[in-house]
Amino acid sequence: MGASKVKQDMPPPGGYGPIDYKRNLPRRGLSGYSMLALGIGTLIYGHWSMMKWNRERRRLQIEDFEARIALLPLLQAETDRRTLQMLRENLEEEAIIMKDVPDWKVGESVFHTTRWVAPLIGELYGLRTTEEALHASHGFMWYA
């Protein structure tokens, strides 16, 4: 047997046509300058709107502060009234508890001054339940 003859493929006569190897992407979107201008415009608009909102927020905050300042004397009067009522109840309870002790003066101040000294929470709530004292010192708590 004889060796087979290999036939090699050859290009067509005149050669192959030119190969287009360049990228042919369509132009789309905005140019770089227009995107930069759009970004700067967005930043300026955002800054302006934040300044406008901050002015409005400051105006509302001043209004809230003025309302609190107007209500503060009323709230302080209610707190003072509640404190004095609790002190009166404590004095009545003290008179009942210490009635058998000689030379005991009910309501005698431990401070040797004629000025008003605000009572401590322990002094106010000493004869009350633990829940009331915790509520006064820490606020309302579910776990107390």
UniProtKB/Swiss-Prot annotation:
Q: Supply the InterPro entries for this chain.
A: GRIM-19
The places in or outside the cell where this protein is found are: Mitochondrion inner membrane; Nucleus
Which parts pass through the membrane?
A: 30-51
Provide the topology term for how it sits in the membrane. Answer: Single-pass membrane protein
Per the record, GO CC terms?
A: cytoplasm; mitochondrial inner membrane; mitochondrial membrane; mitochondrion; nucleoplasm; respiratory chain complex; respiratory chain complex I
Question: Is Membrane a UniProt keyword of this protein?
Answer: yes
Write out the GO biological process terms: negative regulation of DNA-templated transcription
Taking the first listed entry, what is the main subcellular location of this protein, grouped into a coarse class?
mitochondrion
Q: Which Pfam families match?
A: GRIM-19 (PF06212)
- Keywords associated with the record: Electron transport, Membrane, Mitochondrion, Mitochondrion inner membrane, Nucleus, Respiratory chain, Transmembrane, Transmembrane helix, Transport
Q: Does the keyword Signal apply?
A: no
Question: Subunit notes for this chain?
Answer: Complex I is composed of 45 different subunits. Interacts with CARD15, but not with CARD4. Interacts with STAT3, but not with STAT1, STAT2 and STAT5A. Interacts with OLFM4.
Q: Which family does it belong to?
A: Belongs to the complex I NDUFA13 subunit family.
The record describes the protein's role as: Accessory subunit of the mitochondrial membrane respiratory chain NADH dehydrogenase (Complex I), that is believed not to be involved in catalysis. Complex I functions in the transfer of electrons from NADH to the respiratory chain. The immediate electron acceptor for the enzyme is believed to be ubiquinone. Involved in the interferon/all-trans-retinoic acid (IFN/RA) induced cell death. This apoptotic activity is inhibited by interaction with viral IRF1. Prevents the transactivation of STAT3 target genes.
What is the designated name of this protein? NADH dehydrogenase [ubiquinone] 1 alpha subcomplex subunit 13
Species of the source: Pongo pygmaeus (Bornean orangutan)
